[in-house]
Regions:
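Short intrinsically disordered terminal tails
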Residues: 1, 66-68
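N-terminal acidic leader/helix
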Residues: 1-30
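Short, charge-rich amphipathic interface segments used for partner binding and complex assembly
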Residues: 32-65
Length: 68
């Protein structure tokens, strides 16, 4: 697999995981209205990760090779 492509996917995954971590931290002191927004964003990030895992499996790309 092209090394630029792998670096790109890994960069995207790092960003997603950083955003998840930040949202989990914010969740601990969020007001109820913001909490609903945070939970929605977390769910969206988890769905993206799930889709990436499924696609990687379908295309026979080893998860560890791209950082899943």
């Amino acid at each position: 697999m092209n090394s630029n492509f792998i670096e790109f996917i890994q960069d995207v995954l790092i960003t997603i995981h950083e955003n998840i971590r930040d949202l989990k931290e914010r969740r601990s002191f969020a007001d109820p209205e913001e909490l609903a927004h945070i939970e929605g964003k977390l769910l969206a990030y988890y769905e993206i990760l799930s889709a990436l895992r499924s696609s990687a499996t379908e295309f026979k790309i080893p998860h560890d090779q791209i950082g899943l």
